[in-house]
Amino acid sequence: MNITKLVAFAVCAFAASVAQARETILVIGGHPDDLVGPTGLVLLLKDQFDIHLFDYTRGAYMQSNDSEVAKTRMAEERAACKLAGITPHFGEEGDGQAFAGRETCEKLAKLLKELNPRCVIMHWIVDAHKDHMMSSAATIKAIELAGLDPEILFFEETWQSKNMPVHHLVDITDVWDQKVEVIRAYKCQNVNDAIVANKYRDGKFRGSQLHPAEDGRVAEAYSHFQDLPRGRQSVLSFLPPQKPLKEPAVIKPPKPGQVIYK
């Protein structure tokens, strides 16, 4: 083997070892499309971590998990995950009929042991949607059953998250267009771009809090479960540097049903 081939082999081997050593982030949602909450953060971190997603339900409200609705929702979730570089996993709870029972918690605990995530990102625990509250309660119990101690971050959902304390604001301006692409993969839920419009309003509000003197920024809000021990870094410390804002966005109040971002 000549020196050129030897160097090339060594480089490939090193790259493979680095890829294998990458830590994991697990996002937990109640339904296919709840990824729209932390999409920006996931996109910002996907080059440093392996991102996985677990949905407790398959999105077929009060229908069976093998219904056409469930198949459509799962297909859209897979398409969204492909755009975001995420590996999806699906639970078997019924949409609108989800329960945080022992079997449910043990199934997720098994996945947690396999993935050993550095961080778990989930719904805030007080939420207008009962499936969201169930998913967070079951996840916290599953983490205990798995014997793990990952960082836990809660993400914000439009109007559904109730009284969530905001500990972190993450600037997602650089990946906003990519977030829109991911949201639009949920075709049956994003009717008339309603989810895009809602996330745009949320993002502009949080962006104005993060950068009061700089119009045009978009941000996501997060709450943490508990302070990390001294010397242990949050995944938020791996966020890439922000790019300069080229041109402030012109924001117009949307009319009912109006698409405000294209």
Please describe what each predicted stretch is:
Residues 19-115, 141-148, 238-241, 255-261:
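Active-site rim/loop-helix segments in enzyme catalytic domains that contact anionic ligands
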Residues 11-19:
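Hydrophobic h-region of N-terminal signal peptides that target proteins for export
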Residues 1-9:
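Sec-dependent signal peptide recognition
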Residues 34-35, 60-63, 96, 126-132, ...:
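Active-site environment of divalent metal-dependent phosphoester hydrolases
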Residues 149-151, 155-262:
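The feature marks non-catalytic terminal segments
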Residues 78, 140, 180-184:
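Non-transmembrane alpha-helical segments in soluble domains
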Residues 109-126, 135:
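Proline-aspartate-enriched helix->loop->beta-strand connector
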